[in-house]
C-alpha cells in the first residue's frame, strides 16, 4: 500500500492493492426451492465452494480548515467458484461491485453553522435475470443462464444538511440538523421482478421497486 501526508498532516492520501482468497463460501444450488416451514431441509438447497476478492482502494482526506472531508474510490472484483453452479466456473458474487465512490464534505460557515454534503455511487449488485420463459400446466416458468451475469441499475444519490450548534456550556451540548436525503430524487432499485405483460400478451415486463426517493428530515441531538 501507499500512504502519504502533506502540509503538516492537513492532507492525506492512501492507496492499496489487495487480494483475498476465501473458503467455505455458500450459495443456493440451481433451481433451489427455499421454504421456511418447520422441518424444511434448507441445507439441502445449498452448495459450498471457494471465493476470491481483489482490487484497488484509494482515499484522499483534508482534515483542517473551514472545508474538510474525503473522497474514496474502490475498483474491485468479488467472485465465487462452486461445483454445481455456473458450469463449475468462476462467477460474480452477489455483492460484487466494480465501482464504489464516496465524496463527503463539510464547510464551517461560522462557529454555529456548518454545511455538509454526501455523494455516493456504486455499480449495481450482480443478479441473475431470466433469459426466456415457457408455460407448464398453466404456469409461467422462467429460464435462466449464467449465475449473476446481469446487474441491477447503478446506485447513486446526494444528501445535503445544515447543522446549527447553539452556545455550549459545561453541562449540556445540543445541535439541530436540517437535511435532505436523496436530493435529486433518484429512484434506486431495491428489487426487480418479472411478470407477464397484460398490455402485450406473450411478452414479459420488468417491475422495479424503489425506496426513499426524496426525504427531508430534522434531527435534534443533545448530550450531557
Model-derived features with residue positions:
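Membrane-embedded beta-barrel scaffold of Gram-negative outer-membrane proteins
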Residues: 1-43, 175, 179
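Transmembrane beta-barrel domains of outer membrane proteins
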Residues: 1-5, 59-63, 72, 106-108, ...
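Strand-connecting loop/turn motifs
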Residues: 6-10, 62-68, 98, 110-112, ...
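Transmembrane beta-strands of outer-membrane beta-barrel proteins
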Residues: 11-15, 69-71, 103, 115-117, ...
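Gram-negative outer-membrane beta-barrel transporters
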Residues: 18-21, 40-129
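Short sequence motifs at beta-strands and strand-loop junctions characteristic
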Residues: 23, 48-52, 93-98, 150-157, ...
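Flexible, surface-exposed loop regions and adjacent strand-edge segments
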Residues: 29-39, 76-80, 85-92, 131-140, ...
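C-terminal beta-signal and adjacent terminal beta-strands/loops
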Residues: 112, 121-138, 155-159, 163-224
Amino acid at each position: 500500500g501507499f500512504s502519504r501526508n502533506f502540509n503538516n498532516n492537513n492532507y492525506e492520501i492512501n492507496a492499496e492493492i489487495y487480494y483475498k482468497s476465501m473458503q467455505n463460501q455458500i450459495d443456493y444450488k440451481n433451481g433451489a426451492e427455499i421454504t421456511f416451514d418447520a422441518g424444511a431441509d434448507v441445507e439441502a438447497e445449498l452448495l459450498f465452494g471457494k471465493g476470491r476478492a481483489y482490487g484497488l482502494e484509494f482515499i484522499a482526506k483534508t482534515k483542517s480548515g473551514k472545508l474538510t472531508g474525503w473522497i474514496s474510490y474502490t475498483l474491485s472484483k468479488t467472485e465465487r467458484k462452486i461445483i454445481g453452479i455456473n458450469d463449475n466456473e468462476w462467477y460474480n458474487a452477489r455483492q460484487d461491485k466494480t465501482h464504489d465512490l464516496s465524496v463527503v464534505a463539510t464547510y464551517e460557515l461560522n462557529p454555529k453553522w456548518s454545511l455538509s454534503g454526501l455523494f455516493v455511487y456504486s455499480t449495481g449488485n450482480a443478479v441473475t435475470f431470466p433469459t426466456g420463459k415457457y408455460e407448464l400446466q398453466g404456469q409461467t416458468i422462467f429460464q435462466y443462464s449464467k449465475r449473476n451475469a446481469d446487474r441491477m441499475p447503478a446506485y447513486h444519490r446526494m444528501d445535503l444538511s445544515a447543522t446549527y450548534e447553539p452556545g455550549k456550556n459545561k453541562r449540556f451540548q445540543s445541535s439541530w440538523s436540517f437535511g435532505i436525503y436523496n436530493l435529486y430524487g433518484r429512484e434506486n432499485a431495491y428489487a426487480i421482478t418479472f411478470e407477464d405483460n397484460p398490455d402485450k400478451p406473450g411478452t414479459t415486463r420488468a417491475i422495479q421497486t424503489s425506496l426513499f426517493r426524496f426525504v427531508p428530515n430534522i434531527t435534534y441531538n443533545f448530550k450531557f
